[in-house]
């Protein structure tokens, strides 16, 4: 994994997040809170363990994992998912599976920004973060 991912990132733009949350099955009240949140994402690495911590006024979440190894996580909207994160062509690609459903979260670096593309079925959301 590129060390350029490491550090603290703040959300600067978000496109189609509400539709993505709807596709996930997130209820209206939680979607409203999610849309208002301006999360900070802290990515760190210790040995071969990567940690992604997301902090917002809505909720804090943290996942720690080894690339390519499945782990369990509880998402910000309280889904219990099995996830795997892999590295391909410079992107951190996360696949979450729960209740027969699947979503992908791709994190890539573009011009010094972290571009996060979330996809559920045919709904795509793009969130852009700048390093703090």
From Swiss-Prot:
Cysteines joined through disulfide linkages: 118-125
GO biological process assignments: membrane organization
UniProt cross-references to CDD domains, sorted A to Z: FABP8
Keyword Cytoplasm: yes
Residues recorded as bearing N-acetylserine in the entry: 2
Keyword Ribosomal protein tagged: no
Gene3D superfamilies: 2.40.128.20
Location within or outside the cell: Cytoplasm
GO molecular function: cholesterol binding; fatty acid binding
Source organism, top-level taxon: Eukaryota
Residues that hold hexadecanoate according to the record: 107, 127-129
UniProtKB keywords: Acetylation, Cytoplasm, Disulfide bond, Lipid-binding, Transport
Predominant location category: cytoplasm
Residues given in the record as (9Z)-octadecenoate binding sites: 107, 127-129
A GO cellular-component term linked to this record: cytoplasm
Cross-referenced SUPFAM superfamilies: Lipocalins
Other remarks in the entry: P2 protein and myelin basic protein together constitute a major fraction of peripheral nervous system myelin protein.
Protein family (similarity comment): Belongs to the calycin superfamily. Fatty-acid binding protein (FABP) family.
Functional description taken from the UniProt entry: May play a role in lipid transport protein in Schwann cells. May bind cholesterol.
Oligomeric and partner information: Monomer.
Record remark: domains: Forms a beta-barrel structure that accommodates hydrophobic ligands in its interior.
Name of this chain's protein: Myelin P2 protein
Species of origin: Sus scrofa
Recorded name of the encoding gene: PMP2
């Amino acid at each position: 994994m590129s060390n350029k991912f490491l550090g603290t990132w703040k959300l600067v733009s978000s496109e189609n997040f509400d539709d993505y949350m709807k596709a996930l099955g997130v209820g209206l009240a939680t979607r409203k809170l999610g849309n208002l949140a301006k999360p900070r994402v802290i990515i760190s690495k210790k040995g071969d363990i990567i940690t992604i911590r997301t902090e917002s006024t809505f909720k804090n979440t943290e996942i720690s994992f080894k690339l390519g190894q499945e782990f369990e996580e509880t998402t910000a909207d309280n889904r219990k998912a099995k996830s795997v994160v892999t590295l391909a062509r410079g992107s951190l690609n996360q696949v979450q599976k729960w209740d027969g459903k699947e979503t992908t979260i791709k994190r890539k670096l573009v011009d010094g920004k972290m571009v996060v593309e979330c996809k559920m079925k045919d709904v795509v959301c793009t969130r852009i973060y700048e390093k703090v």
